[in-house]
């Protein structure tokens, strides 16, 4: 059986009188960019096999930040335009917005595309989560939009600490990776807040995937990573270590292929139709063509600066806006005051794993 959630498989087996044959670890997440083949040959069932269908060419672009930005953001803009015409031709559109590089560029590109397509930009809102009235994201969102004379589009979504429930997020995401669960808990609070205010709202767009494409994660925080492993491996942040790696989970895929549930599932359970243009293959293909080694010379600081340079240059080339660029901040760290955010989530991964097991064995 194929489904988008583990609990759907569980429900089907229960209804078929086969509940005793279920365990969440028996399921297999289909990895992004592969065809998954399952051989139905009887007991014992063999593991699936995987055939890659998407293999972008690395280092295909010139070491020119302006040209890279033009191509990269141009691809994002085209996909947003296609989405607007095919799936979002009518009804209000919400941007999950922090004023960061990814959500900021998505807002500006969506606004620009709507004008280009003759759509009414009054349909657009920038939704920013603020927990207990705090968080740097709301301040940043205000600065971002004010700098471009677009402040009228901002709509803060207020939540309380009680609205941020990491145990609920574990059940919704059906996973236990701490950073993904923390992000999903904030996404649930945001989506629930929007739903309470606008019962009929359907469309959301966000910037998930932008960090993975431009390799903008602090390498120092992960003892398994070096800048050489990040820059030498094809789509490392999108796919993890790869389906043939000893580090690859049997149940889950890796990288954003696994982690994207943090964005998809909260929106889905709250009744939204979401879109993340940075995850489009056409966009990832251009990102993988960036000559990162030549542009960074293996330096962490240059790598962390590169994303803002590329995206800002591309946004200017595509829309004419001079986009403000702020320092990277995770969703769970920006939506609440930093000193309070730590109290919302347990520090140990074992707590998340325990909650995951309890969800299936109450």
Q: Which residues make up each language-model segment?
A:
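A short alpha-helix-loop-beta-strand transition element characteristic
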Residues: 320-327
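ATP-dependent adenylate-handling active sites, centered on carboxylate activation for C-N bond formation
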Residues: 55-319, 332-346, 356-361
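Non-catalytic structural connector segments
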Residues: 347-351
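Short, intrinsically disordered low-complexity segments
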Residues: 4, 27, 122, 328-329, ...
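RNA-binding accessory domains that recognize and position tRNA/RNA substrates
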Residues: 1-92, 269
């Amino acid at each position: 059986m194929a489904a988008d959630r583990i609990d759907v498989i569980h429900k089907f087996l229960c209804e078929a009188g086969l509940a005793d044959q279920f365990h969440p670890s028996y399921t297999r997440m289909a990895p992004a960019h592969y065809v998954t083949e399952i051989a139905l040959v009887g007991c014992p069932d063999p593991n699936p096999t995987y055939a890659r269908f998407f293999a972008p060419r690395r280092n295909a672009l010139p070491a020119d930040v302006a040209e890279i930005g033009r191509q990269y953001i141009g691809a994002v803009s085209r996909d947003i335009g296609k989405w607007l015409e095919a799936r979002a031709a009518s009804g209000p559109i919400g941007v999950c917005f922090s004023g960061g590089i990814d959500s900021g560029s998505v807002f500006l590109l969506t606004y620009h595309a709507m004008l280009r397509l003759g759509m009414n930009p009054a349909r657009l809102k920038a939704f920013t989560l603020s927990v207990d009235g705090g968080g740097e994201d709301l301040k940043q969102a205000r600065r971002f939009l004010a700098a471009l004379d677009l402040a009228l589009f901002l709509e803060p979504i207020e939540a309380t600490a009680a609205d941020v429930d990491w145990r609920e997020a574990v059940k919704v995401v059906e996973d236990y990776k701490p950073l993904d669960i923390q992000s999903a808990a904030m996404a649930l609070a945001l989506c629930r807040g929007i739903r309470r205010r606008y019962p009929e709202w359907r469309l959301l767009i966000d910037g998930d995937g932008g960090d993975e494409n431009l390799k903008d994660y602090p390498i120092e925080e992960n003892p398994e990573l070096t800048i050489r492993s990040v820059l030498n491996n094809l789509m490392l942040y999108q796919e993890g270590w790869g389906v043939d790696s000893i580090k690859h989970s049997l149940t889950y895929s890796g990288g954003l292929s696994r982690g994207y549930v943090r964005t998809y599932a909260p929106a889905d359970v709250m009744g939204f139709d979401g879109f993340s243009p940075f995850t489009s293959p056409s966009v990832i293909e251009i990102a993988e063509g960036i000559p990162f080694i030549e542009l960074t010379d293996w330096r962490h600081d240059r790598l962390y600066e590169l994303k803002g340079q590329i995206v800002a240059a591309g946004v200017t080339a595509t829309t004419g806006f001079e986009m403000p660029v702020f320092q990277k901040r995770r969703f769970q760290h920006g939506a609440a005051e930093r000193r309070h955010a730590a109290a919302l989530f347990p520090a140990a991964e074992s707590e998340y794993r325990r909650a995951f097991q309890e969800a299936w064995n109450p």
